[in-house]
């Protein structure tokens, strides 16, 4: 611990003035396969019974400019993993870092119904998200359920991965989920084009890498 002195305060002020001169390019880091692999390896060690995954996604949504809160244990009316909102969009969030993405697609429907019944959020105003560690493959049935929800209920469920949220955060992206730009279903399994359009550049992640932007090959 350093003692506060006039000289040290002066030195701090000088440093802050120099920092303020640094050009801010709204870009923290460049994504690549190696960094993502390291991050995914670390996350795979999370205890599945802990709330660490939910808190991580909550913090990333906050970094993107949204208010976000995870559910409280014992609250029977908020069994959803999280809810988010800002002036443009709001909705339920299902978070699935395991293999049970099919359950997440069904769970998000319960979340939408709960928010309408108990909290008055009309389903048409609920821009629901499913955030997974990796995009599920076609055989798991998740994307077919998402397509059915869209066709039958006219409800678009957007799908994002941990990696996609990290890329958006690293680029200080301004995301309006109400645009439904990250909608993917059985006929279009990728959000790569949507992410590249949003950032106006190519994404430096190999196709299929860790299921970040599309299912693994």
What residue ranges belong to the model's regions?
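Catalytic core segments in nucleotide and nucleic-acid processing enzymes
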Residues: 38-213
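Interdomain/boundary linker segments immediately adjacent to catalytic/signaling cores
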Residues: 1-51, 216-217
